């Protein structure tokens, strides 16, 4: 039997976006404008309902001046056959 790593489909990654945004003292609307996305996108990211595109993940990392891994929590689960 071989084990494989996978990400559950339909499950958004956990993240530290809300706390990072609040540390900067900005509103969702302000962050959305800076990143050129909607406020709803920021809200969905913060609430774990949406995974960002790779481009948006990089924009967030550059804005907060930290790595993508410091914003998003990537969890793998082992699948046993």
What role is predicted for each listed range?
Residues 49-59, 77-78:
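Short, basic-rich loop-to-helix N-cap that marks the start of a DNA-contacting helix
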Residues 15-34:
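Short basic helix-loop element that most often maps to the first helix and adjoining turn
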Residues 1-11, 72-81:
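Short, charged recognition helix plus adjacent turn
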Residues 37-50:
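Recognition helix of helix-turn-helix/homeodomain-like DNA-binding domains
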Residues 55-70:
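DNA major-groove recognition helix of helix-turn-helix/homeodomain DNA-binding modules
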Residues 11, 22, 50-51:
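Short amphipathic helical patch at the helix-1/turn junction of helix-turn-helix
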Residues 30, 41, 70:
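Residues in the helix-turn-helix
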């Amino acid at each position: 039997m071989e084990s494989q790593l996978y990400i559950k489909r339909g499950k958004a990654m956990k993240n530290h976006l809300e706390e990072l945004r609040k540390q900067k003292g900005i509103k969702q609307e302000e962050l959305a404008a800076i990143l050129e996305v909607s406020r709803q996108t920021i809200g969905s990211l913060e609430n774990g309902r949406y995974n960002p595109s790779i481009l948006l993940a990089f924009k967030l990392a550059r804005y907060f001046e930290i790595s993508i891994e410091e914003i998003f929590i990537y969890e793998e689960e082992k699948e046993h056959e």
